[in-house]
From Swiss-Prot:
Protein known as: Biotin synthase 1
Top EC group: transferase
Known catalytic reactions: (4R,5S)-dethiobiotin + (sulfur carrier)-SH + 2 reduced [2Fe-2S]-[ferredoxin] + 2 S-adenosyl-L-methionine = (sulfur carrier)-H + biotin + 2 5'-deoxyadenosine + 2 L-methionine + 2 oxidized [2Fe-2S]-[ferredoxin]
Region (Disordered): 1-23
Residues annotated for [2Fe-2S] cluster binding in this entry: C116, C147, C207, R279
NCBIfam families from the UniProt entry: bioB
């Protein structure tokens, strides 16, 4: 009886589905190919890009305060602040500067380097912008980076905020264009792009991302990333939100997104927008420590911290600090990019 000597099988890694690029637009096909990579290959590529641009052990802490809550006229299917949905969120007026100052001081004492103020408006009026500009000056005087998310901006609004010291303006695209109409009908996609253009022209940095887990396909997630990566330039800050299902909203009963699909979205965002801050935003409370750790490995390097994000829950500060300690990671210094 003859014996056959067998040699160990050699491992041949798959050829990259998309070659590294320095310039040029990303197609949805190219980005979908990234999503389709074997998970270890995708994570390796994302971590490699991350290390080329950031210290992979550092995470930015940002705080988000709702300075004007509820009563919004829009119909965003995920949002508990829409007046048309019965979600238990009570409308409130714009906070006074002293209240915002106290909140910013608490955030700074807890380690935040960026302070974002959110107001539930479809589009603020001129008088609203002047009041928010006062809030920006108040927070900026503490030495914190400032960010605001106020809805659609008209001509001149971004310039007023920039003059007050605003560093970043957040205005998310939310989804790919071909899924957008399924979740929002009161504002079209071009409205969002127009606001981003006004922000850029005023010299304010852009914070722009989206929400996943709303029922979109993987290709539509690729479409969202393509829209973000092809902005000129792409956003300095990219918040990726995992849908938080709120009773009373149309998406309250949406099926959960596979956690690995969320991690893939983070990794693809990192590869396609190498120097952006990729932020874990809404939905962290439902992820657990393991998924968050994978997201950091995939290139996320910023979180919103504090026990509430606008109107929904978020891990408490101590839990975030403990998680970073367990991972041998730490908070980053203010962004000087």
């Amino acid at each position: 009886m003859s014996s056959v000597l067998t040699q160990p099988l050699a491992f041949h890694p798959p050829r990259p589905a998309v070659q590294p690029r320095e310039h040029g637009r990303w197609s949805v096909d190219e980005i979908e190919a990234l999503f389709n990579l074997p998970f270890p290959e995708l994570m390796h590529r994302a971590q490699t890009v991350h290390r080329e641009n950031f210290d992979p052990t550092r995470v930015e802490f940002a705080t988000l305060l709702s300075v004007k809550t509820g009563g919004c006229a829009e119909d965003c299917g995920y949002c508990p602040q829409a007046a048309r949905y019965d979600t238990g969120v009570e409308a409130s007026k714009l906070m006074e500067p002293a209240e915002v100052l106290a909140a910013a001081q608490r955030a700074q004492a807890a380690g935040a380097t960026r302070f974002c103020m959110g107001a539930a408006w479809r589009s603020p009026k001129d008088r609203d912008i002047e009041k928010v500009a006062e809030l920006v000056r108040t927070v900026k005087a503490l030495g914190l980076e400032t960010c605001a998310t106020l809805g659609m901006l008209e001509d001149g609004h971004a310039q007023t905020l920039q003059s007050a010291g605003l560093d970043y303006y957040n205005h998310n695209l939310d989804s790919a264009p071909d899924f957008y109409g399924d979740i929002i009908t009161t504002r079209d996609y071009q409205d969002r792009l127009d606001t981003l253009a006004r922000v850029r022209s005023a010299g304010v940095k852009v914070c722009c991302g989206g929400i996943v887990g709303m029922g979109e396909t993987r290709r539509q997630r690729a479409g969202l990333v393509a829209e973000l990566a092809n902005l000129t330039p792409y956003p300095e800050s990219v918040p990726i939100n995992n849908l938080v299902k709120v009773e009373g909203t149309p998406l309250a009963n949406q099926a959960d997104l596979d956690p690995f699909e969320f991690v893939r979205t983070i990794a693809v965002a990192r590869i396609t927008m190498p120097t952006a801050r990729v932020r874990l935003s809404a939905g962290r409370q439902q992820m657990g420590d393991g998924v968050q750790a994978l997201c950091f490995l995939a290139g996320a390097n910023s979180i919103f911290y504090g026990d509430k994000l606008l109107t929904t829950g978020n891990p408490d500060t101590e839990a975030d600090v403990t998680l970073l300690q367990r991972l041998g990671m730490s908070r980053s210094a203010p962004d000087v990019r």
